[in-house]
């Protein structure tokens, strides 16, 4: 078991390693056995871009006449990761060495800037000794705007580099190999990832910029949000931002297309800033009143540990509208915004309109007026209490 820990909110959590690290380790181990059939391996060590060496247990090695397959189980540590425990396989076989300089691995042409920094020609000569491909359960990119060109296997640039470099460490001089990365459960697991939204079909992506999985990593989630916005902004001047599964489902009810909806979790501020940098013209934000009320207060990270203000926004707006203080106090006594809305009942359209106005105002202030903003607010699973501007006009 990988023994690296971090403290998150006072809890000691175990780190894991990425699908990219698993792929690099499996490919390295398979290469060693391919050229040393009598050798047995129980574990394999690789270097990660983070500068930390990782030793991974080998689940299975299968030896065949002209190739070797190695399986490593993904270890996500204490991170709630859909890929935790799945098999990552690398099949390595010898292929004919080439004398003339012909690029047979398409990614060498596409990723020169990532793979080669110094001594470019020398490194290209070395890297073309490892031909890398995606196999079963590794997704195929079908849209523009991602790190990988359309039509190629979804093995991101850093894992590609890791796989090649680890194989080259153990590849005998003059030899050349083909490496095929596969994930037997990849197509099934991919349905629980961002891949379908990004136009990556048939499997998961081989990911990782550091090689290490950090538990509850905000950076990893923000990276996913940025990728989705960047990709969807190519064909959409307007995007629809929502917070999670409930909002995502409600967007479908409202008739928004999957190609324009982005789930941004609690990181609405980051998502808005990314929209601006990607030249998005307008956004519609769709959310539960509990999350949306925080934005009206000027909070752009809506996680409860960052800001617990919700009922106070409803209470303040009621007071500003001149409602009796007994009603204001009743709102503050509720446990949730959901409860407050149900307690109030019908007849408070002006209240929700005022909250909506403040949401739009705060967002425009946050992005310095660089986005047109509409808002949709609901309670329960999909009960609308504010259908704003363009939604009402449709």
UniProtKB/Swiss-Prot annotation:
Pfam families linked to this entry: CbiD
GO MF annotation list: cobalt-precorrin-5B C1-methyltransferase activity
Keywords: Cobalamin biosynthesis, Methyltransferase, S-adenosyl-L-methionine, Transferase
Transport is among the record's keywords: no
Catalytic activity, as annotated: Co-precorrin-5B + S-adenosyl-L-methionine = Co-precorrin-6A + S-adenosyl-L-homocysteine
GO biological process, one term: anaerobic cobalamin biosynthetic process
Domain of life according to the entry: Bacteria
SUPFAM superfamilies linked to this entry: CbiD-like
Pathway: Cofactor biosynthesis; adenosylcobalamin biosynthesis; cob(II)yrinate a,c-diamide from sirohydrochlorin (anaerobic route): step 6/10
EC number: 2.1.1.195
Assigned protein family: Belongs to the CbiD family.
Name by which UniProt lists this protein: Cobalt-precorrin-5B C(1)-methyltransferase
Biological classification of the source: Bacteria, Bacillati, Bacillota, Clostridia, Eubacteriales
Gene behind the chain: cbiD
